[in-house]
From Swiss-Prot:
Keyword vocabulary terms for this entry: Endoplasmic reticulum, Glycoprotein, Signal, Unfolded protein response
InterPro entries (alphabetical): 6hp_glycosidase-like_sf, EDEM1/2/3, Glyco_hydro_47, Seven-hairpin_glycosidases
Biased composition (Basic and acidic residues): 538-548
Start and end residues of each stretch annotated as Disordered: 517-557
Organism from which the protein derives: Homo sapiens
Glycosylation: residue positions: N90, N112, N289, N450
Gene Ontology molecular function: any one: calcium ion binding
The record's account of how the chain is modified after translation: N-glycosylated.
Protein name according to UniProt: ER degradation-enhancing alpha-mannosidase-like protein 2
Signal peptide: 1-21
Any one of the GO BP annotations: ERAD pathway
Family statement: Belongs to the glycosyl hydrolase 47 family.
Phylogenetic classification of the source organism: Eukaryota, Metazoa, Chordata, Craniata, Vertebrata
Subcellular location: Endoplasmic reticulum lumen
Length: 578
């Protein structure tokens, strides 16, 4: 791949105009080194608590110190946290977890899984870890990055999702059974983000494997949404994937829509696709014209542009970061500062904030340790160097430690008004929140490489450049090296015979007898002592005694609340009267 292709990708933030803000209230910005170490300690407190109390379940329940499956029974937190380990510099634990995942994760299971969440967390997490494996000192196989065990796992998981795309419109169902495909009677109503958030992972997968089917279905889904926009250029919140009719016609940048816009921009940068960027810029005009008020973004009726809900949702806080990626720094900073005032008011971002009233919305007062405002701070700090952005990072560390930290990890904040906690630690806390905090305070991290160093890699298809920077984060904060997409370009029939044999060999399942979740008699899991974690010999015996037993609990299948519940909270819903 020509090195010049990395310039618009890797140096995008570095080339943006520089803005220099005022110092903090004490006359100086927070000390990055101090907060970097505190963020690292936060990560290991949460990570070790998961290993000791919850693995191999999906997530940790920090108040009861046990685990439960949520999105699909994949040991999800371990997959989501894997690339964060390397960003924090823990190569030995990264190497160990790669082996654990190969032995313990199975996608041939009778589970109804969210297509959206499985893609961004599992497929995205495995692809990122695969591309970072060599940097982490993993002994990669011949042909890497065009082959490898984590790539095969990512491909297997993605193939389990493909039946969801077999609809008349090409827009996917929201849920698929990993063993049987789409269940009879599955609801055809899917949120916009659940349709338009595949191009980053699926295009990467197609480029690495040589199978175009993944990128093809992702592009079709993107185009169908584009073709379904209203005459004033807006898209709604939920659509029927069988008929293509909008069911919920609320238009905005937040929950149910957010990552669709994000993936148009990131897909355009990753693939250097002018058409995707042009689509986003057209949406951006409509968003500014109809939803933006005093640097806030409201919800409006997608056909009329009339306000349906004057609230700020915490998920919308990704928007300033997205604006920074297209160079719109001034608008990004103004919106960011609006959101930061809400953080200062509550010590976190409530799920819903009523803008005219200046307070939380009933039943949406919680803060599940979401990353979006921190993500925007990280992007904007890279572009501006404004110390105000470090102050947000400082405030986030202080708030989360003070309110959310418990003996077993960090608990979701159920209510920011009285600091009541909920018994859940979502995997994105380790995948996104902690990662973006660390990168905010670590300006020399390899993720921020400006192209001054790189690795030349020989593949079966020629030489390519990797590790030069310009990483594209998927919406779960899993970094993808865009140069990798140019390492494996070939036609399917041109693949080396040895690679075909390798795939055939690895299609045989590795033994998983050591890591069964459905039986207690399989024996305890005993993580070895490792540098950089808080797991000590003294608590090995305690971990053995607390080995969680498999519980029969329903899995989650939607990115947030059930469809009907969500619409009731969103306010007025506009149904098609035809």
């Amino acid at each position: 791949m020509p090195f010049r292709l990395l310039i618009p990708l890797g140096l995008l933030c570095a080339l943006l105009p520089q803005h220099h803000g005022a110092p903090g209230p004490d006359g100086s910005a927070p000390d990055p080194a101090h907060y970097r170490e505190r963020v690292k300690a936060m990560f290991y407190h949460a990570y070790d608590s998961y290993l000791e109390n919850a693995f191999p379940f999906d997530e940790l329940r920090p108040l009861t110190c046990d685990g439960h499956d949520t999105w699909g029974s994949f040991s999800l937190t371990l997959i989501d946290a894997l690339d964060t380990l390397l960003i924090l510099g823990n190569v030995s634990e990264f190497q160990r977890v790669v082996e654990v995942l190969q032995d313990s994760v199975d996608f041939d299971i009778d589970v109804n899984a969210s297509v959206f969440e499985t893609n961004i967390r599992v497929v995205g997490g495995l692809l990122s870890a695969h591309l970072l494996s060599k940097k982490a000192g993993v002994e990669v196989e011949a042909g890497w990055p065009c082959s490898g065990p984590l790539l095969r796992m990512a491909e297997e998981a993605a193939r389990k999702l493909l039946p969801a795309f077999q609809t008349p419109t090409g827009m996917p169902y929201g849920t698929v059974n990993l063993l049987h495909g789409v269940n009879p009677g599955e609801t055809p109503v899917t949120c916009t983000a659940g349709i338009g958030t595949f191009i980053v992972e699926f295009a990467t997968l197609s480029s690495l494997t040589g199978d175009p089917v993944f990128e093809d279905v992702a592009r079709v889904a993107l185009m169908r949404l584009w073709e379904s926009r209203s005459d004033i250029g807006l898209v709604g919140n939920h659509i029927d994937v069988l008929t293509g009719k909008w069911v919920a016609q609320d238009a905005g940048i937040g929950a149910g829509v957010d990552s669709y816009f994000e993936y148009l921009v990131k897909g355009a940068i990753l693939l250097q696709d002018k058409k995707l960027m042009a689509m986003f810029l057209e949406y951006n005009k409509a968003i500014r014209n109809y939803t933006r008020f005093d640097d806030w973004y409201l919800w409006v009726q997608m056909y009329k542009g009339t306000v349906s809900m004057p609230v700020f949702q915490s998920l919308e806080a990704y928007w300033p970061g997205l604006q920074s990626l297209i160079g719109d720094i001034d608008n990004a900073m103004r919106t960011f500062l609006n959101y930061y005032t809400v953080w200062k008011q509550f010590g976190g971002l409530p799920e819903f904030y009523n803008i005219p009233q200046g307070y939380t919305v009933e039943k949406r007062e919680g803060y599940p340790l979401r990353p979006e405002l921190i993500e925007s701070a990280m992007y904007l700090y890279r572009a501006t160097g404004d110390p105000t952005l470090l102050e947000l990072g400082r405030d986030a560390v202080e708030s989360i430690e003070k309110i959310s930290k418990v003996e077993c990890g960090f608990a979701t904040i159920k209510d920011l008004r009285d600091h009541k906690l909920d018994n859940r630690m979502e995997s994105f806390f380790l995948a996104e929140t902690v990662k973006y905090l660390y990168l905010l305070f670590d300006p020399t991290n390899f993720i921020h490489n400006n192209g001054s160093t790189f690795d030349a890699v020989i593949t079966p298809y020629g030489e390519c450049i990797l590790g030069a920077g310009g990483y594209i984060f998927n919406t779960e904060a899993h970094p993808i090296d865009p140069a990798a997409l140019h390492c494996c370009q070939r036609l399917k029939e041109e693949q080396w015979e040895v690679e075909d044999l390798m795939r055939e060999f690895y299609s045989l399942k590795r033994s998983r007898s050591k890591f069964q979740k459905n039986t207690v008699s399989s024996g305890p899991w005993e993580p070895p002592a490792r540098p950089g974690t808080l797991f000590s010999p003294e608590n090995h015996d305690q971990a053995r005694e607390r080995k969680p037993a498999k519980q029969k609990v329903p899995l989650l299948s939607c990115p947030s609340q059930p469809f009907t519940s969500k619409l009731a909270l969103l306010g007025q819903v506009f149904l098609d009267s035809s």
